[in-house]
Amino acid sequence: MTSQTPSLSFEVFPPNPAVGNEKILRALEDMQGLAPHFISVTASNNKYNIKETTVPLADHIQNDLAIPTIAHLPAIYLGKEKVAETLRDLDAVGVHRILALRGDIIPGVEPLKDFKYATDLIEFIKEEAPQFDIIGACYPEGHPDSPNQISDIQNLKKKVDAGCSSLVTQLFFDNERFYDFQDKCTLAGIDVPIHAGIMPILNRNQALRLLKTCENIHLPRKFRAILDKYEHDPESLRAAGLAYAIDQIVDLVTQDVAGVHLYTMNNAETARHIHGATHSLFKHHSQVSAL
C-alpha cells in the first residue's frame, strides 16, 4: 500500500434530450464547489446520440466549469468511422480523457463487429488518436460475461497492456471483495491506479433496480439488513444508505485506495453530503494534473 492522498470524483449522466439540461446544469454548478478530482459523463449505446448528449455536457464541465472531465465511450454498436468522429468531436472541445467500454449488449440487437471487446477500442484509440488518456472499467466481482474471475483479470491485463492508464470499478458494497480483487490484480502485474466505484442506495426503487440488473454484486448482510428494515421508510433508508456509503469510503481511504468514484445519479445533494463527511480525506483536483 502507499500513503498517497486519494482522489474523490463523480459520475453524471446526460438527461433525456426531451427533458432538457436545466436540472443537470444546476447540479453541476453545486458539484463544482466540491472540487472533484474529475467528473465522468456517461454515454448510452442505444438511446441517445453521443454527439448531442455526452459531448456537449463534457464540454461544459471541462471548459465552463474547469473540472477535468472523462467521456464514456461504449463502442459495441459503433463502427470505426463513428468512433473516429466522436474522438474528433471530443478533441475539438479539449476533452482528452476517455473511459473506453465495450458497452452493454441490447437483447435482440446484433452488435457491430469492429469493437467486440473494450481492448479492441483501446487499441484503436491509441493508434488513431494517441493524444487521449484512456481509462478502463473493471469488475471486482467479475464481469457478468466472464466464466470466472481468473479469466476476467487476464482480460483486464490485456486492457492495461493495450494502453489504459487507470481503472474505475463497477459499484460494489463489500470492501473485502474489492481488496481481494486488488491483490489479484497486483499478482497479475496490473499496476495502474484503481478507483473504487461507490453508489449510495437512497430509495427503494433504486435498490430494486440494483437487485435486478447487478446480479453479480454481493450484498453483505449489513447492507441487506438496511434494505429489509427500511424498505418502506424512505427517510430512514436514505439516511442509512448514505451512512453505509460513507463507512465504505472511510474504510477504503484507510486502506490507501487510489481514489473513490462516486456514482451520483446526478444528485448534487448526495454528492454534497458525502463530500461534507469525507472531504478532509481527499485531495483537491487543482493539486494534481492527472488521474
What do the PLM-derived regions correspond to, one by one?
Residues 11, 39, 90, 159, ...:
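Conserved, mostly hydrophobic/aromatic
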Residues 7-23, 69-81, 135-151, 228-243:
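Active-site mouth loops of central-metabolism enzymes
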Residues 23, 75-89, 112-117:
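Glycine-rich anion/phosphate-binding loops
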Residues 21-30, 47-67:
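Glycine-rich, positively charged N-terminal anion/phosphate-binding segment
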Residues 19, 113, 117-139, 187-247, ...:
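Active-site pocket-lining/capping segments in soluble small-molecule metabolic enzymes
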Residues 35-57, 103-113, 164-178, 264-267:
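Glycine-rich, proline-tolerant flexible connector loops at the mouths of alpha/beta enzymes
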Residues 12-15, 42-46, 72-78, 103-105, ...:
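Active-site beta-loop-alpha junctions enriched in small/polar residues
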